[in-house]
Every structure is written in structure tokens, then in C-alpha cells.
Amino acid sequence: MRPAIKIGIIGGSGLDDSQILESRSEKVVSTHFGNPSDVLIEGKIAGVDCVLLARHGRNHSIMPSNVNYRANIWALKTVGCTHVIVSTATGSLQERIHPGDLVIPDNFIDRTTKRAQTFYDGNDMLVGVCHVPMEPAFCSRTREVLIETAKELGLVGVHNKGTVVTIEGPRFSSKAESNLFRQWGADLVNMTLVPEVVLAKEAGLCYAAIAMATDYDCWRDCGENVNVADVMATFKKNVTKVTQLITAVIPKIAEMDWTETIGELTKTVNGSIMLPHAY
């Protein structure tokens, strides 16, 4: 029997408008890990059950370090989500990725310092230590559907893969850091994908991201360096591409049989947990 598909959408800077949902209703959820960033907005897209959550709160009052990523992911799991699709604003570290382009990331580098990265932290609810493997980092099948849907829509400036460096923030990178990330082979820099992607995998959710390049960070010797005004202006100008892709991909995901994918993910997580034992 196929699992019932329910898709969580985590909206980042510039994409937390509940108008993309039909038959909207708000749901207050609290978790063992605290409260999520905002209420959950439940509704439908093309008849598919969806849940929208504003990562930074609907008034964008929560800085990246203070987002309760564990509560956000656990809240979506609690209400029955099988998938999570997120949007995120990023700085481009490569000339070929232009502001306004979309990237479907396939890997990450973690440069955060202050964030809880596991649900298995010694609490009474989840026993043991979870050494979850992060290859693949994102759900391969969900990424494939996003890529194919972008092609079908004829969206220009869509890159099929990319490595994202997640920094702690809220400050932007120094030029030395930006160039270091480029030397590492990174394509984008942002402040929110980690630990979100890690926690989603621990929770057994099929997670994929749509990253929008909003600027060139500060590595270039010519042109303006990243600033908030330009980031938001670029996102606002191109956000319709993100919403178009999300609304088109959701019915495609719902049509597919995810039994094996979800089963394999659950098996991976369960096999990663080391339980306490006596010597």
C-alpha cells in the first residue's frame, strides 16, 4: 500500500506567502524540542496535502542561528509530512551561477558553530546516538523530479547540482572566507540549509532544496559586494520561478510511489542508531 503523501514547504527569505495554498488553515504545534518558527499553515496545492512553515517566522524576526530547526522539522514530521521542499537565498561562488538562477543542491559543507544537529541528544524520547550518513545529502528522487519539472516548465538558469556552504551568520562572509569556499569547490553560500538537511534525514523525510542565487557574495574584484537590499530585490524579482516550480512539482511527487524510497530511508536511519549497552 502506498504511503499517503504530504509535503512540507519551508519558505525562506521572500517565500513564506501562504497564498500558494488552497483551503488554508492554521495549526499550532509544539514539540519535544520546543516551538517551531511559526504556526503551520495547512492546505492543498493541486489537491495534494501540504504544510507551509516560515523558517524565520512570518515577520522575519528570527535570525539564522536562532531558528529552532529541530522543532521545525519535528513539527512537519508530527503532522504527517513525508517530504520537505525548501527555498533558500544563497550567494553565488561561481561566475556561471548568476543572480536570479536556481540551483538544486546535491551536497553541503557545514561551517555553522552554534546549532543542534541531531534529535538524539540524550533526551528521554529518542534513545541512543544517531550516526546518520549524509551521502546522499538530499533525497535523490525528489531532486530528480524538481530538475525534470524545471525543464518541462522551460525555466532558464536552473542548475542541476551544487555544493552549498552553510555559514553561521547573520553576518556575510569576508572576502578571504568567500575565496576559501571557492577553493573548496563550493558553488553557493547560505545560512540555513544546515542543520535542516541533516535533521530531515534523521526524521526520515525526503528533503530537497531550491536555492536561489541572489548575489555574488564578495569574492569578485569587480562589482558590488553582497548587501541585504540587493539580496531581497533579486529574490523578489525572481521568486515567481520558485513558486512556479514548487506548485508544478507537488502533484508530480504525489503521483509517484514512494514506498521503497521512504522504506530505505527509514532503514538507513534505524541502522544508524547506536543504543546504550553494558560492557
UniProtKB/Swiss-Prot annotation:
Pfam families according to UniProt: PNP_UDP_1
Residues noted as binding substrate in the record, renumbered to the chain: 191, 215-217
Enzyme class: transferase
Site (Important for substrate specificity): 173, 228
Domain of life (superkingdom): Eukaryota
Pathway info: Amino-acid biosynthesis; L-methionine biosynthesis via salvage pathway; S-methyl-5-thio-alpha-D-ribose 1-phosphate from S-methyl-5'-thioadenosine (phosphorylase route): step 1/1
GO molecular-function terms, A-Z: S-methyl-5-thioadenosine phosphorylase activity
One BP annotation, GO: purine ribonucleoside salvage
InterPro entries on file: MTAP (IPR010044), Nucleoside_phosphorylase_d (IPR000845), Nucleoside_phosphorylase_sf (IPR035994), Purine_phosphorylase-2_CS (IPR018099)
Binding site for phosphate: 13, 55-56, 88-89, 192
UniProt keyword list: Cytoplasm, Glycosyltransferase, Nucleus, Purine salvage, Transferase
Entry similarity comment: Belongs to the PNP/MTAP phosphorylase family. MTAP subfamily.
Function: Catalyzes the reversible phosphorylation of S-methyl-5'-thioadenosine (MTA) to adenine and 5-methylthioribose-1-phosphate. Involved in the breakdown of MTA, a major by-product of polyamine biosynthesis. Responsible for the first step in the methionine salvage pathway after MTA has been generated from S-adenosylmethionine. Has broad substrate specificity with 6-aminopurine nucleosides as preferred substrates.
Binding partners and assembly: Homotrimer.
Protein name: S-methyl-5'-thioadenosine phosphorylase
